[in-house]
Amino acid sequence: GSEMCIRDSSIVSQLYHDGYMEARSVEQTKVFEAAEQFARIEGILPAPESSHAIRVAIDEAVKCRETGEAKTIVFGLTGTGYFDMVAYEKFYNGEMRDFIPTDAQLAESFASLPQVPGLDN
């Protein structure tokens, strides 16, 4: 994947905290499958970061089709994937692997984060 530094917006974090949005975990290969589908239909190679949102939007649309629910689905396309061709190459060559950390690995990682005064840690 990408070696980019990804930061959370304080506004997005607050919207999540207040229950206006949810976070979802998506396997890397499923993300790139969605990116490929989007590129074939729209003619735009999406950035991997945007492709996570595309995957979830597709999943939501399929769920709505199956349940008959009418819903407006919006996602952000924040960039193209032309700077991340190595990741696309790994996907197409079958070299990309999904990594799903265990609860113990997550707990160990979270325990190593610095404590920030004034935040719920």
Describe these PLM feature segments.
Residues 1-6:
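Short, small-residue-biased leader/transition segments that mark boundaries at the very start
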